[in-house]
Amino acid sequence: MCRCSADSSPVDVKDILNRLKSLSAAEEFFEALGGPYDPKVLDVSRLHIMKRMGQYLAAEDFSHLPDRVIAARARAILERAYCDFATSAPLSHRVFKVLKDHNPNRPVTPGRTVVPLDSFLKPFEKK
């Protein structure tokens, strides 16, 4: 596990939601909220973790809450999203639409044909 803040200083909770909105890298979220993470898990599942965190945050009502409570809830949500993917493969959760729409157990829809890429390349091969 990686401790995001090497000096383990307290998390700055002032205006935390607006600060989180300005972040882009997953590591920045863990650093801002003071949460630990395993870089190996983050390397594989960062987009899934961030998407799931967004889903969890969207379900929360932070209006009229003090910044300290918002920061604590946001950290708990980040840790929950992280744990979702730390113990299982990202594909098993299907957080993205393309994964939700694709069921590997469902046969290909009749009438849809898969054309191998090799069939396109053959006319361009040197003889």
UniProtKB/Swiss-Prot annotation:
Biological processes per GO annotation: nitrogen fixation
Listed InterPro entries: NifW (IPR004893)
Presence of keyword Nucleotide-binding: no
Pfam families: NifW
Coiled-coil ranges from the UniProt annotation: none
Keywords: Nitrogen fixation
General function of this protein: May protect the nitrogenase Fe-Mo protein from oxidative damage.
Recorded family membership: Belongs to the NifW family.
NCBIfam families: PRK00810.1
Subunit details: Homotrimer; associates with NifD.
Protein name, UniProt field: Nitrogenase-stabilizing/protective protein NifW
